[in-house]
Amino acid sequence: MPKTKKAHRHAPDWIILTIACLAQFMVVLDVSIVNVALPSMQRDLHFTIDSAQWVVNAYVLTFAGFLLLGGRAADIFGRRRVYLTGLTVFTIASIGAGFAATGSQMVAVRALQGIGGAILSPATLTIIVTTFHGKRLPRALGLWSAVAGAGGAVGGLLGGLLTGWASWRWVFFINVPFGILAGVLALRYLREMRNRDAAVKLDVTGAVLVTGSLAALIYGVVNTTTVVNSRAIGWTATSTLLWFLGAALGLATFFIWETQVASHPLVPLRIFHVRSLSMANLVMLLIGGAFFSMWYFLTFYYQYILGYGPVKTGFAFLPMAIAIIVGAQTSSRLLPKLHARPLLLIGTSLATLGFLWLSRIGVHSSYTVDVLAPSALCALAIGLLFTPLASAATTGVDRADAGLASGVLNTSRQLGGSLGLAVLGTLAADASARFARPLSAAALTSGYERAFQVSAGIALIALATSLAVPKVIVAHPNH
């Protein structure tokens, strides 16, 4: 049973939503805001082209690796304590990134920032699902989903504006006022809540095994794109296969430990018996694979093919942010009436159509005629999907496992995004190389077309998987 400490003062719904959404916005924003600033960062910190990718990879690696631990920590130590811990680590790391003087310093603080994000992000969803109930929950999830989805698009806009008008360092400093505001509100209004039965039990061995295994898996994936002697290492390189082997052995050991040895497992595998949670995470894995790469490829398409600068690239993403917000708000209003599965079917259908449409872009395409509508359609699909996925993944579980369910869902999204970007990046590079060498604008566009075609196929698989999500999800008695 949850144990609740007396709040410092009664908090209106909008303040709790602000506490959760502000922190989630910071975490999601930092995944995309760096992309537009990378060329300037690379020049000032004297990165090589090959090593600059680790500004992104270091964050992704630790963020994905620590998400399950962060989610379970919110259940065990309390959502308020974990939220403030993650927020502090994330904000301090942002300051460090803004002041970084060398490439190695930047990679180190980005890794620390990823750990802070992994602690913080599951806590934000835990705050939502343990505070709001009944008809209030879909509305709260809708706003949280809108913020989570729009952060990717807004990151491109803010990154372009800050890099073009100030300095790339401000893509990190921008987190500081948000972090201070969120921290003050949490200290003043957020009450503590944790699982009394698990209050003093943390499965340290399980945490080490799953964190190390996921980190090895993600490292193996990003290792495929590492360039050595002008060629990517690829999927069949010995180093890549060794990382995958280590991840497989670690996950197998983790499974045995959790099911046979641990008295208080980090991830009680019983939660995967909840079909809504299992299927929602599978859909999220697929959707993450398709959508994470969209931001990446469109950023390069705008700058290298259409010739946009950082600021114009940022504004090109603005309609997508608006579409995500519209989709999320629409989804939150329809969820109590339609339930999750119909919304998932609609969202994945729109995503499939949007990616197919995007796959028709060319060297001489126009943004307003050929890119705006399909990218907005994909963004609308993101908004429609996140709310029912969050609802399906958390409604059927005990409130004592809310943080864990949040961590699992975030892990699925991040793991899908990392795998999707690596696979689609490899396919795009292969298509470009087959088209022409040295690479031309037409060759690069050919690679982007291939990536969007495969993304449409992934979205179609997600559509089929959505049929397995229960039509009506019964809430757990202790939810």
Language-model regions: role of each:
Residues 177-195, 211-226, 246-261, 462-472:
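C-terminal membrane-cytosol helix-exit motif in multi-pass small-molecule transporters
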Residues 7-9, 183-212, 227-236, 260-275, ...:
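Flexible interhelical linker loops that connect adjacent transmembrane helices
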Residues 151-184, 202-210, 218-244:
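Helix-loop-helix hairpin linking two adjacent transmembrane segments in secondary transporters
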Residues 23, 143-147, 205, 283, ...:
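Hydrophobic alpha-helical segments of secondary membrane carriers
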